[in-house]
């Protein structure tokens, strides 16, 4: 992630939006791991967003915020909009587009290489990198799908 953000010149306090964050994965973990990140976790379920706020307060994380909202209501620009288990790639990019900064990136954690989902993306969304990952203790395929708006 840091490599992709650095390529955009976003080493200093990049703004991340974790869509459908639920209990804070991966948003809260990223906020803990890198205090320079400004992480906002948005969820349509109020108690989930409230939990993120409680985590931020309990762990004294000024760089973590929980928001009770629908992602399509988000208009503040974010350098990286990410999701772990939110929607198809097409729905994820469509619903979160208003929250993406002009040079921003989307990042989605998926299971198997999502060839059909990639093929269903609108022409203005470009997949520029798919990174296979392994999760210790989990015998399953996972990958990170990096996307951006075409220039």
Give each language-model segment a name:
Residues 71, 86, 135:
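Hydrophobic pocket-lining residues within nucleotide cofactor-binding pockets
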Residues 56-57, 97-99, 122-123:
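Short, solvent-exposed amphipathic alpha-helical segments in soluble enzyme
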């Amino acid at each position: 992630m840091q490599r992709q953000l650095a390529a955009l010149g976003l080493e200093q306090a990049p703004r991340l939006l974790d869509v459908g964050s639920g209990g804070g994965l991966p948003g809260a973990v990223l906020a803990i791991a890198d205090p320079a990140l400004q992480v906002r976790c948005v969820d349509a379920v109020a108690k989930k967003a409230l939990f993120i706020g409680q985590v931020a307060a309990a762990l004294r994380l000024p760089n973590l915020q929980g928001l009770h909202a629908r992602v399509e209501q988000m208009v503040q620009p974010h350098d990286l909009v990410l999701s772990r288990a939110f929607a198809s790639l097409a729905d994820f990019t469509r619903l979160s587009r208003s929250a993406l900064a002009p040079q921003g990136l989307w990042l989605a954690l998926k299971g198997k290489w999502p060839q059909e989902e990639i093929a269903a993306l609108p022409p203005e969304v470009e997949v520029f990198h798919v990174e296979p990952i392994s999760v210790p203790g989990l015998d399953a395929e996972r990958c990170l799908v990096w996307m951006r708006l075409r220039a």
